[in-house]
Amino acid sequence: MRLRSRTAVVSAAALAGVLAVTTVAPAAAGEGPRAASSSKGHESRDKHGLRVATYNASLNRGEQGQLLRDLSTPDNQQARNIAQVIQINDPDIVLLNEFDYVPGGRAARAFRDNYLAVSQNGHAPVDYPYHYVAPVNTGVPSGLDLNQDGTVGGPDDAWGFGLFPGQYGMVIYSKYPIARDRVRTFQHFRWQDMPGNRLPTDYYTPEQAAQLRLSSKSHWDVPVRVGHKTVHVLAAHPTPPSFDGPEDRNGRRNNDEIRFWADYITGTKSARYIYDDAGRRGGLPRGERFVIVGDYNSDPNDGDSFPGAARQLLDNSRVHDPQPTSTGAVVASARQGGANRTHVTRPALDTADFSDDPAPGNLRVDYALPSKNLPLLDAGVFWPAPGRPGSELTGEYPFPTSDHSLVWVDVKVPGRR
């Protein structure tokens, strides 16, 4: 990823495309046995569990307001393809990364009403009565020269890289009520306030270091009421560990953005330093149920990540890693070659189709990680092998949807009524 320019990433993201369908390892790879494509499938799942998904949908644009214009009518092809992927997998709750923030939730409602609620290519519409959007740090001017180029302004000097405020934002859609009065956001949490942080000591000025925000977008704790129980959707989209220099400022930030959730879910002293945007301190109380979702831009073994970054969640004692796989990822890795040939992570676990030669190759960067007190039922990655149903929604650059796959997990909510 270090070999891509920021310009290339912005333009590619506007086109991008998704991937495949699978089952929990070590079950046989293929189309997930409960990847619902109809309301009947959802009714069946109601008896067994809750499906939570994450999808970097690449619904970002290079100009402020363009996404809202694209979604205001039902004929944007990329949006139709994204909606079809969601309809095929029919999650009860889904986080979309790289969905430009528009104040008032207008873009979120437009995508829901004009695309998700409309049958795409014969698939049953999905109804999401509830959604959550909030401001993010991308594109918000910092007033500081954060890239040390001698000038103040531009995407690299924003609190999170972005051409305009809200670019690369997030939205959560839910079939179940969101407890809005209990939502916590951490957009303004300062990086230096994390004990033992990896903030570069020889790159930022003291003035800059004192003001830097940790989240490149934001961190959200969104409680969802499932029957009489609550499941916390912990959503984020850490910065890519690339596009920097030997100081590794983005790799270090990515590591600490991931660590934030690892500390937050402990429910112990290690979370006392945390404060939210309303000033409330502390992490998630022990015993609470959660699913960590998002594009974390970190593979546990490959790519440019700071050593051990993803392992902070994958090896966490409170987290269950379902290790979802897909057949499409295996085929893509073998056919594309390049950096994929030397990867340590099994190709079946990949969730994103990145440049292969010279680097970084396809990676596992998108996660849906439930707490261990949510019994795991199934999980998958929507990346069908060529010729399988849905494979027309995937492909190589320019992608019909996104360069990331939708990742889902089915969990049982104990005592749900």
What are these regions (language model features)?
Residues 7, 21-170, 200-212, 227-231, ...:
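N-terminal, active-site-proximal structural segment of metallo-dependent hydrolase catalytic domains
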Residues 155-196, 216-218:
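A substrate-binding/cap region within the structured catalytic cores of diverse enzymes
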Residues 177-185, 193-194, 223-224, 252-258, ...:
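Metal-dependent phosphoester-hydrolase catalytic domains
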Residues 231-252:
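Active-site His/acidic residue clusters
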